[in-house]
Every structure is written in C-alpha cells, then in structure tokens.
C-alpha cells in the first residue's frame, strides 16, 4: 500500500483538511510533518464543524493513527486545548503519536514573534504571532527545545538558560520588555511533561514499519507551496518546508517510499498576509469570492485576499512537488458568474512568462494574461458525479486540467464531507 503526500498548491487554505479527511477512512496513518498552529483546517462532519490547528485531520477518523512528526513545532498549551475540545465532543484522541524530535514553542518565542512583527511596521511579514518563526530559527541555530527534553529537567533547564541568554538581551534592550526567567519557562513546559509522555514515540521507526507491513500512510502538509521557505514567495513565506520534500525530512521516511503526491488547489486563489499576488481582485469580484467562499482565516479570522485561478502557479506547484494529481476545491463558489477568468501567463514589462518568473522582483510586477470561460448558474452542491455538473462547469474543470498540466482527480462542490466528486482513485492511481 502507498505513502501519499497531500500539499497545498497555492498560498494555503485550499481545503487540505477536507481532502485528507476524504482519504482518511482508507488509510492507516495520517501524519502532520511541518508547521505548527499557525495554520488551520476545517472539517465538516454532519452538523459538526471541526477547526483544527495543530492536530492532524486524521484524528477525526476512527481506526486511523494521527502522527505529529519531527518537522512540526508544538505549542503544548494549544495541543492540549485542541485535545480537550475534541474529547468533550466525543472524539477519541488516544491514538495520537508525537515525535520525540519535534521542537517545542516556548512562551518567550510567542512574545518575540509578536513584538518583532510590531517593530517591523510596514516591513512586517504578516505572521500569526504564534512563535512559529522564532522556534524554527532556534532549531536552525541549535538552541531549540525538543519534546524529549521534557523528560530530563537538567537538560531542559540548560537549554532554556542557553536560549534566554540572547533572547533576554533582545527583549530588554531592543523591545523594552521584561526579562523572562528560567524558572517560569521551565515550569510552564514541565506542566505538560507527564501528559505528553504516553504519546511520544520514534515516529520515523513507526512509519517505516507501517509501510513495511503494507499499511497506507498519508502525509499532510501545513501551509502550502507558495509559502514554502525555499520555493515560496520569499520572504513572505512560512518557516518550514511545505512542499512534498518536507514529508521526508519532517517525518523520517525516505523519498523512495512516496507513491503519490496530491496537490489541493482552489477553483480560484486566496492569500492571507503580505506578499505578491498577481491575480488579486480589489473590487466587487474580490468581495464576491470572499463572501461566497467564506474566505476568513481559521486560525486568525483575518479576511483573505482573493483572486482568479492562476495556472502559472498551478504548473509551478506541480513541478516543485512532483504532483501526480490535483484535488480541485470550492468549484461551487464560482456559480453565478457570467464569465470566469483563468490566468494562463504573466506579462512583465512587455515580456510574456508562461512559467514562474525566475526572480521575485519580476513576480511582484507580473500582470496576469487571462483566458475567459463561460460561467454557470445551476446549483452544483449536490453533484456527485462529473456528469452531474453543468456543461460549462465541466468545461471549466477540463480547461484547468489542460492549462495546469496535471489531472484533476477529485472536485469539491461544497463544505460537507460528502460534497466531493471523485474522478480517479487517489490512492491507486
């Protein structure tokens, strides 16, 4: 059975949670391999809506083992808040496994994240202020705190002391904040040690053994391709690897283990925070997409920026991830439009780019070149086969498939769990 990676193919909020939830009933493990609680995904089951930020969406599916990999940064307070909320709603969370190598978000990094963003003013990146970036910076600077450190107070105290030597200088002398004490930080972290201990495993070993047994493992990316620290619109990106490659480094499996890579992509485009966005709409069309699509962040509540479908980005995401399939979401949001534009290339100072411009400056100044397709007015939320869709909706999907270069294997036509049209089997190909 396969290892399948699910990634966002735009700037996030594409509906990865729904896609992984759809596959979840057919897999044995669902693994979150990057990011933290800086992104959220919503899963609707019947009348219940679940907004998850740190936990893998597989936790909602009985008999599936949800895993938090070593590439994730964990806020323990948020972790246990989410677990408590799910428990009160009758969800069994006892199967959760967490990598001993995952890094922890200490309280001082949340503080640093918020004050740094305010300090940057107009140059701010648009972070969520949850300490994600500073914690990944600690990881790369080799002053980070890992889950396994909770079980040796001496090591934990030494690591906190080492980190605070510099961080207190910044807090006090740059931001005019009070110094953080070693004791308050250690106490805040140790509060969770006994509760988290039963969940901690060597996730690399667990996942490789599962694949050896022929079980199916699904890896879900946080954020998205265009927010990837290497391949996204740098510096307006997240701090982790949000492409398919991150599934390997963030969980401890080798690249030859991966069988399929699925990109989740909206029928239009959205973005939260700062950074370039070639197809962005500022007028009535943008507001229509925002209101009809409910485009407000699960984690922040911020209104998302909206724009038309961008095939240049879709082709780029397919290339850097090695996509085998697209899952197209929110097709129903486009119902009622007379014409639906699709960006197929960019114009940059009179030069046409059919692929992503090689430098960030050109991308900032890119003007989309559109093709226009006829819209449809029929309600498609109850469509369950491709033939149930209006002819113009079918043509739109087929056109996106053609200009994006990767087959569309499933189509989302509403928020409900069942509101999905399968075209090809995502697990077997």
From Swiss-Prot:
Catalytic activity: IMP + L-aspartate + GTP = N(6)-(1,2-dicarboxyethyl)-AMP + GDP + phosphate + 2 H(+)
Details of cofactor binding: Binds 1 Mg(2+) ion per subunit.
Active-site annotation: 13, 41
InterPro entries referenced in this protein's UniProt entry, alphabetically: Adenylosuccin_syn_GTP-bd, Adenylosuccin_syn_Lys_AS, Adenylosuccinate_synth_dom1, Adenylosuccinate_synth_dom2, Adenylosuccinate_synth_dom3, Adenylosuccinate_synthetase, P-loop_NTPase
Any one GO CC term of the record: cytoplasm
Disulfide bonds: none
Pathways per UniProt: Purine metabolism; AMP biosynthesis via de novo pathway; AMP from IMP: step 1/2
Residues bound to IMP: 13-16, 38-41, 128, 142, 223, 238, 302
Binding site for substrate: 298-304
Cited function: Plays an important role in the de novo pathway of purine nucleotide biosynthesis. Catalyzes the first committed step in the biosynthesis of AMP from IMP.
Subunit relationships: Homodimer.
Protein family per UniProt: Belongs to the adenylosuccinate synthetase family.
Protein name, UniProt field: Adenylosuccinate synthetase
Species for this entry: Beutenbergia cavernae (strain ATCC BAA-8 / DSM 12333 / CCUG 43141 / JCM 11478 / NBRC 16432 / NCIMB 13614 / HKI 0122)
